[in-house]
């Protein structure tokens, strides 16, 4: 199950018209569709991708 070192990431804005690098970050996190949450580990790599596209995501502790 999820523990304190997991993050629940949800895409809340569309990827249409975004930079290719930002789309790659969202895909790298495993998010596929708007409003479908994904649980990822809280690592520096994932935090970096989340920070880069934070304007499109909602992040909660899982």
UniProtKB/Swiss-Prot annotation:
This protein's superkingdom?
Bacteria
Q: InterPro entries, per this entry?
A: Ribo_uL30_ferredoxin-like_sf, Ribosomal_uL30_bac-type, Ribosomal_uL30_ferredoxin-like
Supply the Pfam families for this chain. Answer: Ribosomal_L30 (PF00327)
Q: How does it assemble?
A: Part of the 50S ribosomal subunit.
The UniProt entry's sequence similarity note says: Belongs to the universal ribosomal protein uL30 family.
Q: Which NCBIfam families match?
A: rpmD_bact
Q: What is this protein called?
A: Large ribosomal subunit protein uL30
């Amino acid at each position: 199950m999820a523990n304190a070192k997991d993050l629940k990431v949800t895409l809340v804005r569309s990827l249409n018209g975004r930079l290719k690098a930002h789309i790659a970050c969202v895909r790298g996190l495993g998010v596929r569709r708007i409003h479908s949450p994904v649980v990822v580990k809280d690592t520096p790599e994932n935090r970096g991708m989340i920070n880069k596209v934070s304007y499109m995501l909602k992040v909660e502790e899982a």
